[in-house]
Amino acid sequence: MPCLAGPDYSVENMQEMISEWRSLLTADDLKGAWGYVPASESNAFGNTGWWELNWSSQDAANAAWSQWASNTEAVAWTEKYENVLSCDAEGRNALDAVFPVEADHFGALPESGYFYSEFYHCFYNEGSSKADAVAFLPKYTAGVYENTDGFDGTSFHYGNYYAQLNEDGSHTEEGIDFLWASFTNSEASMVKANEVFESNMRSTLFPQFSEFATCREDVIDIYHGWTFYNSEQKDFMPDFSSN
């Protein structure tokens, strides 16, 4: 869901806000949560940040959102921190996400929970669909593993977010079919990962990708990110002072 920093936004207030939010969590179906802060003035959505929630299923997500909306403590928390971070729950985007490479396969992410990310807006060619995009993933993943030496130490992993195009979602207006995302442990690591792709993978894989989709290369959304919650490490807390 899209979020905007308010006049009281600060590292200290974010630490407090996320700590209190975590104390309100009751849904076992929540697998993870991440926050994104713009790292480029040329992002397509300007200074909009994002709060990503990963659920076990669409039904679980819908049920949890319904419960959250009627939770008096959740409403109070939202009002308490609206000048720190204001998020548009009604404008959230429903996305089906796939992450073919484990986040720590090419090195552990920082203990602070920080990560660096790039998102491309992608569109299916006429006659193509999500099925074509999913079928391409094993080919790309194989290319990644074939270049282990290049990616080592970067924490590189990637994901595809397939849009459900919910009526009020911000990505619906843009007509985005799916997002192609890359994640690393730093900006320098992203530069390294992109160099590996350009040198060793693009000539083989890009023509295959172009058979079913195109991505805007004139606008790449770049973010500093933090893990807010990890169901496999429930005691983890991010450190927003580190990047």
Where do the model's predicted regions map?
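Short S/T/G/P-rich N-terminal loop/turn motif that feeds into the first structured element of a domain
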Residues: 1-243
